[in-house]
Amino acid sequence: MASDEQWYVLVEASYGFTDTQWKLEEKCHVVGGRSAALSRAEEICRTWCPFGWKPEECGRTVFEVSETSWLVELIEERWPESDDHAYTRGEHFRVTVARVVHPKEAPPAHPPEKKAGAIRRAFGGGR
């Protein structure tokens, strides 16, 4: 194992009602190599919740898809005062351990060059 390897735990959550899509919600850098990343991923599977969910108010089933990937299903039951019955909502997210294989940062943005147009010249700008 190279000492400069970078390990991450990635959390992808589904969103949308009709055409569900996946979005990268968390990108957690882990120091300590692959085994530390696996431990952190298992912790995230047991504790992480999407926005609007409370861990203490939902059921959770963790599925190990592979040695480095999990699918977590959350289920919550509520009984609003205005209804005569309870309802159930569900959500799921993926947790994956990943090693960075090609890091390339985006180049920094620069302000656009000011252009001397006809109006700018009329007011003395762009000389």
Predicted regions and their residues:
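Short, well-structured hydrophobic secondary-structure segments
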Residues: 32-39, 46-50
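Short, mixed-charge low-complexity intrinsically disordered segments
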Residues: 47-127
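Short aromatic-glycine-(Arg/Gly/Cys) micro-motifs in beta-strand/loop hairpins
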Residues: 1-26
